[in-house]
Amino acid sequence: ALGALKNVGIEAMKLITEGRMVDGVERPFSTLFDLARRVDMKRVGKRPLEMLARSGAFDQLDPNRRRIFDALDGLVGYSAAIHEQKSSNQVSLFGEAGDDLPEPRIAPMDDWLPDERLSEEFKAVGFYLSGHPLDDYMAALKRKDIKTLDQVHERAERGAHVAKLAGVVAGVQIRKSARGNRF
């Protein structure tokens, strides 16, 4: 399902899914660094990883989406170094290839504000998943007898109905006709 996210694709998700398999058993990633060690993030690509961070796919590893998003360059570099070392069969004195590489520092920072978080999620998924920009206004909308889309559908099944709706303008496109008139 995550392969359907914008700019992610099946191949990127296949690499991540394969990284979850350890000795034939599916094991979830425990941290972002565990993900970087088990999946060659450079092969996955930065753009798919950005979209996964925006969508909340890594929320179990770190709920601060902005920190993950901003740390991707370091994580991709760390992952590339580990996988380069593994492919050259270099093993440290202390264990497997890449185990001796220090984890990059992820700077502490505030997460995106709720509106920013929803906006970033919308960019990745194409709709609001964890909330809606109008959630903060629901009490006021109910007082004004504004209906939800579900309520409108429910009433429409019973016959013609007039309803007030609220929405969010997601974008504006101003175009010009052949005569130069804007519409």
Language-model segments: what does each one mean?
Residues 1-158, 175:
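Sliding clamp-binding short linear motifs
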